[in-house]
Amino acid sequence: MNGILAVYRKELEDHFSSTRFILLSTLILMVSLVIAFMVGSGLRDELKDVAKPTFVFLMLFTFPGKLFSLISFIAFFGPLIGIVLGFDSINRERSDRTLSKLVSQPIYRDSIINGKFLAGLVTITIMFLAIVLLISGLGLRLIGVVPGPEDVWRLAIYSLISIFYISFWLGISSLFSVIFRSMATSALAAIACWIIFSFAVPLVASPLADAIYPVDQSTTAPDPELLVQHEQARKAISLLSPMTLYSEATTTILDPLRKTTQSLLLMGPMERLSISRFQNPLPLRESLYIVFPHLISLIAITSLCFAVSYIFFMRQEVRST
């Protein structure tokens, strides 16, 4: 345990003093605040003469401003945080010839990779919680609505899901750092996975579903069973993307009016407020039931990536030269 803590403290100090991490975290924080400001200003203007519902505070995170929502921003660019923290975690030690010195210390070998992953996880947690707290404070000032207990719980669960989502990319980049000796190669491999899973998979989901279950668009009344099979196939393919898992889970958690992980309608704030008068929002427990498979999937793939990294690292030969 002492070995893990020693590596953890050293890596945590390196992360917070790294120039690239400081620049990336500052950029993400600034963009997040700009998005929250635009969304908050728009909500304040539209809700000026309207009775504010209890969940209006959560709209800061779910509704797009002039660009996109905070959920979409974290879904697309949050993985870069994990990649930056992990792509050189092991091969940097190899290139600096310090890995053999670490292994020769009176610590267990697995303390090295465990301490490095723990430091990355804590760094992600601190950074994301700082973003959520700053946006919440900005929202309090802009829309003047104090979040209720359920809003706080939903934000806490949203933060937990986001931390696991970014940690998955930390595990992916750490795995490539163990496999490849070149830091540039591991970084490119991690970025390639990010592009494939975040952009390519959602784009090809519909064409693949069309190929598996072709729907004749020329007919006025297509087969309902075929339409259901087509939609199920498209959803199954899109769920291969961690970004889709994350987006559906967090949107359902932060939007109490959503009773499914996928919505066919796009509504603005005023439409949301109008429809809320005719339906009751889901309680937190019901929302958790809906997103529980997504949360378990994110935890599973994150654990799998770290486990594979752990096995590869423990079986690799470490030479002193």
What are the functions of these language-model segments?
Residues T19-E46, S69-I83, A189-A205, I301-C305:
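Hydrophobic alpha-helical transmembrane segments of multi-pass membrane transport/permease proteins
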Residues F87-V122:
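Helix-loop-helix units of permease transmembrane domains in multi-pass membrane transporters
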Residues M1-L29, V318:
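Aromatic- and glycine-rich beta-strand/loop motifs that create alpha-glucan
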Residues I179, F292, I296-T321:
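Junction motif at the cytosolic side of a transmembrane helix
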Residues V34-G42, M183-I237:
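Transmembrane helix segments
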Residues S32-R44, T54-I74, A119-S174, V178-I179, ...:
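Secretory targeting signals
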Residues E46-V84, R285-S297:
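Membrane-embedded or membrane-proximal helical elements that form or frame transporter/channel pores
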Residues S18, I22, I163-A200:
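A structural motif at transmembrane helix-loop-helix junctions in multipass membrane proteins
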